[in-house]
Amino acid sequence: MAAFAHSAPCWADVQLSDLEAGKRFYGGLFGWTFRAGDGMHFADAFSGGRLVAALAAKKDGRMPTTWGVYFATDDIRATVAAIREHGGQIITEPVRAGRAGIVAQAADPGGAVFGLWQPEEREGFEKQNEPGSFCWTEVYTRQPDRVDPFYEKVFGFRGTDLDETGHDVSDDAEALVDFRMWSPEGVEPGPDTAIGGRSVITDAFPAELPSYFLVYFAVADCDAAAELTMRLGGRVAQPPFDIPYGRMAVLHDDQGAVFAVLQPTELLP
């Protein structure tokens, strides 16, 4: 398994009230298979025999039912210090996750929660950017003026606004959205090198919606995935629509966790 570059999204997991129901839902939607973790409080998810995510049983019913993303770091304590220096908060101090690695939880200045992962025996995803696996993440925030410099200073991201990419988005849903893509340090920023992004929570969203990271999974057929989600007991928050990079939908699983599916352009008919 290849090592992830510092600042790259390297892992995703979902916190659920009912772990077995989560297995049924995501197994039905993505074809995932599962292996129980130590203590049986979480399950690793596999696509085609390769590790793609984890499902975890919530330790406290008051915790949100949500997907979370983790960024790779070469030095988790240095990254924690940078987060504090640039206006973020540490929710969970670095702690060992068995022999797999060291993990921490943080929040950006707008309140969006994300994880840090310093690998040891487990690097992260064994499969991504293929159907049934992670392909993208973006943070939704009401404070882009604070959040953009935070991520660019903490992780060294270089940003590209959507209107700088050369795509004609005049007929796309994203044309109405202030959207910024992030590329890792050391590469030319742009769509070809982007590993994540930032969108803005506008007045079109519910006033009570907090800042959050939206996790995307690649699928071979976006419309079919949305239909299957409903058959499995989930719901469609945003029906399938076209963007410059494919066709996507925003969905909720049968316990309320939100995520997105993306049918990349090369898989469109």
Regions inferred by a protein language model and the residue ranges of each:
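Core segments of cupin and vicinal oxygen chelate
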Residues: 2-51, 85, 95-101, 141-193, ...
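Short, low-complexity cationic-aromatic patches
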Residues: 2-7, 18-20, 58-66, 72, ...
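C-terminal functional regions that serve as terminal interaction/effector modules
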Residues: 5, 16-19, 186-196, 200, ...
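Short, structured motif recognition centered on aromatic/hydrophobic residues
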Residues: 9-12, 66-73, 114-117, 134-138, ...
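Vicinal oxygen chelate
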Residues: 18-20, 46-51, 69-110, 144, ...
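Conserved beta-strand in the GNAT
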Residues: 53-56, 105, 114-115, 195-199, ...
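Short, structured interface segments
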Residues: 106-126
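A short, polar/charged loop-to-alpha-helix boundary motif
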Residues: 121-131, 267-269
